[in-house]
Amino acid sequence: MNNNIEMIDLSNINQNTNADSNNVEAQKTNPSNPNNISILEMYGENLSRKEYVTNPAIGRDSEIEQAIVILLTPEKSALLVGKAGVGKTAIVEGIGYRMKNGMIPNALKPYELIKVNISSLLGETKVGEGQSENRLQLLVDELKTKKNIILFIDEVHLLVNRNTTNMSIDFANMLKPGLDRGDIKMIGATTYEEYEAYILRDRAFLRRFLKVDLAETDEDQCKKILLGTYPKYEKRTGVKLEYTDYLKEKIFRFIVQMTDEYKRIYEIGNRYPDVALTIVMSAFSLASYENSPVVTMKHFYKAICRTKVVYEDAKIKEIARFKELFKDILAEENVDLNDM
């Protein structure tokens, strides 16, 4: 033991002592977190380190740039507002994609973009609002301490809608001081309905944000999204889409036009590009289920047939159009749609 003492580098003693003092001081300043629990690690997903197969926000450069400019604005955070299914989360992932690939301004390069599931964070706290308040306070303290985190909260209206969480705590008030000082940078996302019902009523919370309106993508944008997204489904399922570029574009255009023409009779809440992406994803899943190495017209046909619509007549019309438009390739693949 004495030998070990003689081998100690005395030059490190002061450093070690200082480190120990800092740890003690940290525990003194935050007695509610003696075990140094990281809420960001427990409930967060790091979107700036995520492995992206493709750019998740194709055709949304303008909205992404708007959000980034807001994040560069002192003491302001970004609020994405749009209908359900327009791709709010995809836009935030698009920012994460840019961060991962160094495609952002230098001022944001030290930052990490972390998505926190606020519903899980609050939903699990059934023992009482004291535990909820403690978790939120730990999150706020962690954000203030690290200072290089951009927090993304989907359904950000939950922070001000206390009726949803059945709590009497105003969680938004816990964030306001940090947002005011610029200690906390944030991206929130919500729908127009929730924005008008809850966010607009809390003017003090709202003034910390600048709004980015997300319009529904048009037909051309949606087709580009499908063309840019299908490689992700190839990787996930191990199934390939091996048609020519011309035929791929023709298939995706049909799907986009179908969802455009009948989007008003699809189940409420589905919008571009949500329905179209679901159909393409379903085609890949069906091929994987059948252990097929490739996606065929049969799989697209089945996916279209299984799409939920309110009026069955609309689906019948679209199926007839599909059969006519792709009759040559259906014949080439020897697909008998009458057997399905």
Where are these regions (language model features)?
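AAA+ P-loop NTPase nucleotide-binding core of proteostasis motors
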Residues: 2-340
